[in-house]
């Protein structure tokens, strides 16, 4: 692999001869290392020309993969003038012909003969080399503008690693069992191709190799056409850093973050490892260049092979922005909280139904969070793949343009700057016309064939991996669909349960309202106490009323007697008045006839008159007093009549209240008796359920006497109750059908205690009686169920009516 360009150095800079050494590594071929004495001797350049021939090196990876996802660890500055041309100074003294020590090829003779026939001289090779370098330089000039990516893309191998063998380990060591000879030959073949990739301003290595042109005809005319050969000289990173301050003013500056892949570490196994870096634009299968789509698939396969997704954390695998990573962490914390709630909720003392519902909700939340997280990861990987596809295509196009355009411009500037220098110099060193020997060409062909085989193997491996990934994707999609169906079914179940719970809650509320309206035992007791108190008050009032009536009758009798006395006195008064008038007439007559009356008669008449006056006065006084008493008695009679009317009204009200309370008491007593009866029946049914089998019971009953009075009485009671309940239900159903309000006592099963039982058949055998008893119990249960359904429906209707009102 042509991995480096060697820049000319001054002889007194780092070494006397100006030759600089490189460490052996996977980016350097063993045929061009100083340990094998394969470095070409460098020429000495004056100090004033040192900053003119060095060009800025873009910071990229050593792999030569157009800078996708990788970056160089050591920044190398571009040393060039404002014109951008290179000025080479030829050797001032006799320079020996440089020799490239090449290992002997073990390839077949047919391949070497074919290469000798195809390349008889070095001129054809040099022209093809210049075209390839030009193509590379143009592509890299275009790609240099779009390679400033400040996001760190970590742990992603470069595109050139597709040429690495399949049995490479994670440390980069090769496990293929080949001989050192074959590895060195492959390294030499790759060293040739690596030189074609590293020319131009966007070279992707730690150090550069600069071309030095020397005239191949020193003793001929200096004005003749220069047929140049390429010499290589190593220049270290310190030489490029020395003039970094003067060359930061270049218009195109590409910066990349450092990657550990750009700094290879030399190990014992890597000394004989073939270089892994080969530009994808120069790979070919059967002489035909590889298409960009195939190249992209090869690169993605290598990415997945070298750095699988399971081994990467969120920072290294996705290379996201900090705000996106924060969102993912928040989402994961949010998905972990339901699990904590689920594990912690078991310690709380909730009802079992509520715990089940909370568990379902937490499980649903956790599963939805995991599904969303996986969807986010899948979408992000798809976006990364599409983004990498686009960058690969763009960078390949730019690399091709740079390769086409860059080297032609550099070659023109080199020739223009070297021609006056060669005219002024007197001593020039002849160089051989042959650039690459036939053995090297055979090695290159062998390397090309091996790379083609590797490319085919990688294509097959890529197809297999793609098929596996498609199958895994289908499986994941099926799993997601099944999970979605499961989640939808769970949601439907939750909705049904919630609806059922709501219906039950409504039913409970209506029943609670209905039961709240019914009186309780305390209310019944308080009402009974009030009833007793009111009854006592009523008795007292009735007694008082009787006494007052008796007194009234006595007073009436007294009034009648007094009225009769008054009538008699009025009659007497009239008689007295008449007597007085008669006496006055007599007096007048006597006065007229006074002369004739004697004196004794006059005195007697005067005495009688005085007596009569006194009697009249006393009688008038008695009459006035009796009249006053009569008026007073009339007033008392009127007041007593008002009191009697009021007492009658109060007694009527009390009687009505007493009647209502008596009805309530009767209804409550009936309800209590019915409840007691029902509890007795349930206890009896439970006792019957706890008894042994029916056959044993029949055998026991057969041993009893035929006429078991207790069973007959119980049967009669049950049949009478069922008959009463059936009648009540029929009446309730008729009332509901007619649109009337049902009787609550019948609806609740409250009945009076004086319910007579009907007579039954004369067959009183124990077996028939037990069968009838079981049938009656079943009928009883059916009636209870019918009553509950009707009462629930009525309560629901009442609740709906209350809600609407």
UniProtKB/Swiss-Prot annotation:
Residues 60-74 have a biased composition (Polar residues). The modification Phosphoserine is found at residues 15, 207. GO terms for cellular component: centrosome; cytoplasm; pericentriolar material. Isoform 1 and isoform 4 are expressed in spleen, lymph, thymus, tonsil and peripheral blood leukocytes, with isoform 1 expressed at higher levels. Isoform 4 is detected in K-562 leukemia cells and in the blood of precursor T lymphoblastic lymphoma (T-ALL) patients. The keyword Kinase does not apply. The record marks 674-675 as: Breakpoint for translocation to form the CEP85L-PDGFRB fusion protein. Residues 439-682 form a coiled coil. GO terms for biological process: neuron migration. Pfam families: CC4_CEP85 (PF24555). Disulfide bonds: none annotated. Changing residue 345 to F: In a breast cancer sample; somatic mutation. It comes from the Eukaryota. Changing residue 69 to R: In LIS10; uncertain significance. Residues 1-27, 50-89 are annotated as: Disordered. Belongs to the CEP85 family. Plays an essential role in neuronal cell migration. It is linked to A chromosomal aberration involving CEP85L is found in a patient with T-lymphoblastic lymphoma (T-ALL) and an associated myeloproliferative neoplasm (MPN) with eosinophilia. Translocation t(5;6)(q33-34;q23) with PDGFRB. The translocation fuses the 5'-end of CEP85L (isoform 4) to the 3'-end of PDGFRB. This is Centrosomal protein of 85 kDa-like. It comes from Homo sapiens (Human). The gene is CEP85L.
């Amino acid at each position: 692999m042509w991995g480096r360009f060697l820049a000319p150095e001054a002889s007194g800079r780092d070494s006397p001869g100006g030759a600089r050494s490189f460490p052996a590594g996977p980016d350097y071929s063993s045929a061009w290392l100083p340990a094998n004495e394969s470095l070409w001797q460098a020429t000495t350049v004056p100090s004033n020309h040192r900053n003119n021939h060095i060009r800025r090196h873009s910071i990229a990876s050593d792999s030569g993969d157009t800078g996708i996802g990788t970056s160089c660890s050591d920044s190398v500055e571009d040393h060039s003038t404002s014109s951008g041309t290179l000025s080479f100074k030829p050797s001032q003294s006799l320079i020996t012909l440089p020799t490239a020590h090449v290992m002997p090829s073990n390839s077949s003779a047919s391949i070497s003969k074919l290469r000798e026939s195809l390349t008889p001289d070095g001129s054809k090779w040099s022209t093809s080399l210049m075209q390839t370098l030009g193509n590379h330089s143009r592509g890299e000039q275009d790609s240099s503008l779009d390679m400033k990516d400040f996001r760190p893309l970590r742990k992603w191998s470069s595109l050139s690693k597709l040429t690495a063998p399949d049995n490479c380990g994670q440390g980069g060591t090769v496990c293929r069992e080949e001989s050192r000879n074959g590895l060195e030959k492959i390294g030499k073949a790759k060293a040739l191709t690596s030189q074609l990739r590293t020319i131009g301003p966007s070279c992707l290595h730690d150090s550069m190799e600069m071309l030095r042109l020397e005239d191949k005809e020193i003793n001929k005319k200096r004005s003749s056409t220069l047929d140049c050969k390429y010499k290589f000289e190593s220049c270290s990173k310190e030489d490029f850093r020395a003039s970094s301050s003067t060359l930061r003013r270049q218009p195109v500056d590409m910066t990349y973050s450092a990657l550990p892949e750009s700094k290879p570490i030399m190990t014992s196994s890597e000394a004989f490892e073939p270089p892994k870096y080969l530009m994808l634009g120069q790979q070919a299968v059967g002489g035909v260049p590889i298409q960009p789509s195939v190249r992209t698939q090869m690169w993605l396969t290598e990415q997945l092979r070298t750095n699988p997704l399971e081994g990467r954390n969120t920072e290294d695998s996705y290379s996201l922005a900090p705000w996106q990573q924060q969102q993912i962490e928040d989402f994961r914390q949010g998905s972990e909280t339901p699990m904590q709630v689920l594990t912690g909720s078991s310690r709380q003392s909730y009802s079992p139904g509520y715990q089940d519902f909370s568990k379902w909700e937490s499980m649903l939340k956790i599963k939805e969070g995991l599904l969303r997280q996986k969807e986010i990861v899948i979408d992000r990987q798809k976006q990364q793949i599409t983004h990498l596809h686009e960058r690969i295509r763009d960078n390949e196009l730019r690399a091709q343009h740079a390769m086409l355009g860059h080297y032609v411009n550099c070659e023109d500037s080199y020739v223009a700057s070297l021609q006056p220098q060669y005219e002024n110099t007197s001593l020039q060193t002849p160089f051989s016309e042959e650039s690459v020997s036939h053995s090297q060409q055979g090695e290159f062909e062998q390397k090309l064939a091996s790379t083609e085989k590797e490319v085919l193997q990688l294509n097959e491996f890529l197809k297999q991996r793609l098929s596996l990934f498609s199958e895994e994707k289908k499986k994941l999609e099926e799993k997601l669909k099944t999970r979605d169906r499961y989640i939808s079914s769970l949601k439907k179940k939750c909705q049904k349960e919630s609806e059922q719970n709501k219906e039950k809650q409504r039913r409970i509320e209506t029943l609670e309202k209905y039961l709240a309206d019914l009186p309780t035992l305390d209310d019944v007791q308080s009402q009974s106490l009030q009833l007793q108190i009111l009854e006592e008050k009523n008795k007292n009032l009735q007694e008082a009323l009787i006494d007052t009536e008796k007194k009234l009758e006595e007073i009436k009798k007294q009034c009648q007697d007094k009225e009769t006395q008054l009538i008699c006195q009025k009659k007497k008064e009239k008689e007295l008045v008449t007597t007085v008038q008669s006496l006055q007439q007599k007096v007048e007559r006597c006065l007229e006839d006074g002369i004739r009356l004697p004196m004794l008669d006059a005195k007697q008449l005067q005495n009688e008159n005085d007596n009569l006056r006194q009697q009249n006065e006393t009688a008038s006084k008695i009459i006035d007093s009796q009249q006053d008493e009569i008026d007073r008695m009339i007033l008392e009679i009127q007041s007593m009549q008002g009191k009697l009317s009021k007492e009658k009204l109060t007694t009527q009200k009390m009687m009505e209240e007493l009647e209502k309370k008596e009805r309530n008491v009767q209804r409550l007593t009936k309800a209590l008796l019915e409840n007691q009866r029902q509890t007795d029946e349930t206890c009896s049914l439970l006792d019957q359920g706890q008894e042994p089998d029916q056959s044993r019971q029949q055998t026991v009953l057969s041993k009893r006497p035929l006429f078991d009075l207790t069973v007959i009485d119980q049967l009669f009671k049950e049949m009478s109750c069922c008959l009463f309940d059936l009648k009540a239900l029929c009446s309730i159903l008729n009332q509901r059908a007619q649109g009337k309000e049902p009787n609550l006592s019948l609806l609740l099963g409250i009945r009076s205690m004086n319910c007579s039982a009907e007579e039954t058949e004369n067959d009183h055998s124990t077996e028939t009686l037990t069968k009838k008893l079981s049938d009656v119990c079943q009928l009883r249960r059916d009636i209870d169920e019918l009553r509950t359904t009707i009462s629930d429906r009525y309560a629901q209707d009442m609740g709906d009516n209350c809600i609407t009102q």
